[in-house]
Curated annotation (Swiss-Prot):
Family affiliation: Belongs to the MshB deacetylase family.
Biotechnology: MSH is a glutathione analog and is essential for this organism. As MSH does not exist in its host (human) enzymes that are required for its metabolism (such as this one) are potential therapeutic targets.
Miscellaneous field: Was identified as a high-confidence drug target.
NCBIfam families from the UniProt entry: mycothiol_MshB (TIGR03445)
Reaction it catalyzes: 1D-myo-inositol 2-acetamido-2-deoxy-alpha-D-glucopyranoside + H2O = 1D-myo-inositol 2-amino-2-deoxy-alpha-D-glucopyranoside + acetate
GO terms for MF: hydrolase activity, acting on carbon-nitrogen (but not peptide) bonds, in linear amides; N-acetylglucosaminylinositol deacetylase activity; zinc ion binding
Residues the record lists as binding Zn(2+): H13, D16, H147
Protein name: 1D-myo-inositol 2-acetamido-2-deoxy-alpha-D-glucopyranoside deacetylase
Assigned EC number: 3.5.1.103
HAMAP family: MshB (MF_01696)
Textual note on the cofactor: Binds 1 zinc ion per subunit.
Amino acid sequence: MSETPRLLFVHAHPDDESLSNGATIAHYTSRGAQVHVVTCTLGEEGEVIGDRWAQLTADHADQLGGYRIGELTAALRALGVSAPIYLGGAGRWRDSGMAGTDQRSQRRFVDADPRQTVGALVAIIRELRPHVVVTYDPNGGYGHPDHVHTHTVTTAAVAAAGVGSGTADHPGDPWTVPKFYWTVLGLSALISGARALVPDDLRPEWVLPRADEIAFGYSDDGIDAVVEADEQARAAKVAALAAHATQVVVGPTGRAAALSNNLALPILADEHYVLAGGSAGARDERGWETDLLAGLGFTASGT
């Protein structure tokens, strides 16, 4: 197929794209694919690492969201994506915070009118016409309310984008997304990667997670696809994570990173997926696709 492949990743906050799909995004952009990332909020309720940005948080100046626009822009540039896309425009819906976070605004993403959120994403899908859409599983990966809601909104938008044409809620020509994936954490890959870390990879304050702290991962038999990126793509992922400096610290060797909880996780080149919609392409001996574009008529290189 001579057409340029198009992939769309839908995430809740800045940094989610790099943590979950950084190597995948870099893998496809380096092969000439058109990749876009939609971010649903500015991540205003995020914690920050260290004192340097402490006054930006919601409890102080409440300027973290605006600052994170710059972080996301730099991270996407490292991954080969030209610019971020914010659902409804930057700042339209606010980070809802973790479960139990005080409601600071009537614009919380989880409280938004679904006609508006789904409609905004349908418009993006119909404009970009992606061959692949990626978002979280129904649990939002680890259960963050915005991640769960992003799954709900994206699932509804993928379905609605292919139905009808030119309505007030869903303008534009319909587009049926050929393949729809959930991004998931491959548990065995994470455990193997964590076991391979050595003290030189870690900062002194970091600890390796216990098994119950990574219980949201998927076993191998629950996975449908893997993107096994090369070292160049993994290096781009490291650079993207480093760009999210309010949220992520990359270790001294670039083999591990941690959030504000100081749990050290390996920075993996392999990223895993579950096929939620569309037909699978060729699978390997593990029963996994090794290309999200498999079965769509593109060449093995993804272009």
